[in-house]
Design a protein with these regions (language model features):
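Soluble FAD-dependent oxygen oxidases
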Residues: 1-468
Length: 468
């Protein structure tokens, strides 16, 4: 039990007072619409706030933050709920999904989007003028949370860096209830903290970022039988080392559910899913991926010229909420010994219960500091490993142990830093572990800024950086 669990309920009169100041709905537990606003992607971490504000604009966010400040309550933020690591008990949940403004400036190759926008909406708008954003693997993820956590694009990452590296300005409501327009020039420290520090410093209501003059890429996925994991993984491991920055790739060991929506060869199958995205000609792309394509007979091969609006087809991330447990680590190297460990733990003789364990190439521009620095902590590391298992709390201990076994096996090659957007609930709520996630120097700087911008730790329903 935490201090927030002991906070009193918000009374109907208090909620009504806030509702008189807001244009969006204000909801208490039991109200119609409350449960829908609290729904998130990981059903094992239910949100249970004392009050929900369905913000329609930045003024609603300000009203919610000021209300929380008067009552000494924490504030949490949700657009789609892809990374909610605490239940928000006793707090004010600001739901931004109604804030849907999108403005694409084709001449400047930029977009300004409000906090409730998801990536598919930006992709569709940008494509109309021949541009594309640095969206992630899941097109239904919210732009703001993804970008504030760094933002790893499976298409543009290795050639352009993190999504956070291309942010030009942010509009954010800080703990004092003020709406600030933040740029590298007018508040360089807050700008640095927001991009990588995620939701610890305020509620971002809008952001402006670069777009790229790209309409398609050569990419897709090849599904191999899981029984050929050894050949495919070792081939991919050797192959990726010589790839140009324009090529991005990942490999996932997956045990797929028997869903009718899946093609018959994949239904309930044990597979190795290799994904590719090449920013170049299809002829050159086909030549580059040929060694992996030849590693084993494929079940399905979807690699082709692909519009940027269809980036979700690369990873085929689950589109609906489910109960799951996950873990992640960053690797300094992935030698043959590391590949053999994964084959032992995940291969055809393992009976692994994990739904997916994937390894993504990093490197290239992801290693380089951007022109305007930010707090993204994962530069200089060539791989990120991420795994998840599907199951409710009854299987939680079992699935967590299986995930830990995989991550522990990678320990000889692992770094102590992590990608913030990939943190599990267990990792994100371990205050000592968070210091390692960012590294000592970066964490000290974030802590100092937290004391300045959020001294009471209002924004703590997250991977919390405490003001001390």
């Amino acid at each position: 039990m935490t201090f927030d669990d002991l906070l009193p309920r918000v009374s109907p009169a208090e909620a009504a007072e806030l509702a008189s100041l807001a244009s969006g709905p204000v909801l208490l537990p039991g109200d119609e619409g409350y449960d829908a606003e609290c729904l998130i992607y990981n059903l094992n971490v239910p949100l249970e706030p004392a009050l929900v504000v369905g913000a329609a604009d930045a003024a609603d966010v300000q009203a919610a933050v000021r209300f929380a400040a008067r009552q000494g309550r924490p504030v949490s933020v949700k657009t789609t709920g892809h990374q909610q690591v605490r239940p928000a008990r006793g707090g004010v949940l600001i739901s931004t999904r109604r804030m849907k403004g999108i403005a694409v400036d084709a001449g400047r190759r930029r977009a300004r989007v409000e906090a409730g926008v998801i990536w598919q909406e930006v992709m569709d708008q940008a494509a109309k003028v021949g541009l594309a954003p640095m969206s992630g693997s899941a097109p239904l993820v919210g732009v703001a949370g993804y970008t504030l956590g760094g933002g790893l694009s499976p298409v543009f990452g290795r050639s352009q860096g993190y999504a956070a590296d291309h942010v030009r300005s942010l509009e954010v409501v800080t703990a004092d209830g003020e709406l600030r327009h933040v740029t590298p020039d007018n508040d360089p420290e807050l700008f640095w903290c927001l991009l990588g520090g995620k939701g610890n410093f305020g509620v971002v209501t809008a952001l402006e970022f670069d777009l790229f003059p790209v309409t398609s890429f050569y990419g897709g996925g090849i599904y191999f039988p899981g029984e050929r994991l050894a050949e495919v993984l070792h081939t991919w491991r050797i192959w990726q080392a010589d790839m140009p920055e324009e090529m991005s790739s990942s490999v996932a060991v997956q045990r797929l559910p028997p869903l009718p929506a899946l093609p018959e060869p994949l239904r309930g199958a044990f597979v190795v899913h290799v994904r590719f995205a090449y920013l170049g000609s299809s002829v050159e792309g086909e030549r580059l991926i040929a060694p992996v394509r030849a590693a084993a007979p494929a079940l399905i091969d979807t690699v082709e010229e692909t519009p940027c609006t269809a980036v979700g087809a690369l990873h085929m991330d689950p589109p609906t909420p489910m109960p799951y447990y996950d873990r992640t680590t960053l690797l300094r190297a992935f030698p043959a010994e590391a590949a053999d460990k994964l084959i032992e733990l995940l291969g055809p003789g393992s009976d692994s219960p994990l739904a997916s364990v994937e390894l993504r190439m990093l490197g290239g521009a992801l290693d380089r500091e951007p022109e305007v620095p930010n707090a993204v902590s994962s530069r200089g590391l060539p791989f990120v490993l991420f795994g998840f298992g599907v199951g409710t709390s009854e299987r939680g201990e079992f699935l967590s142990a299986e995930l830990e076994a995989v991550m522990n096996a990678m320990e000889p090659w692992a770094d102590r830093r992590r990608m913030v957007n990939f943190l599990s609930t267990e990792e994100a709520t371990d205050s000592e572990r968070l210091k390692e996630v960012y590294g000592a120097e970066r964490y000290r700087r974030l802590t100092a800024a937290k004391k300045a911008y959020d001294p009471t730790n209002m924004f703590r329903v997250n991977h919390n950086i405490s003001p001390g």
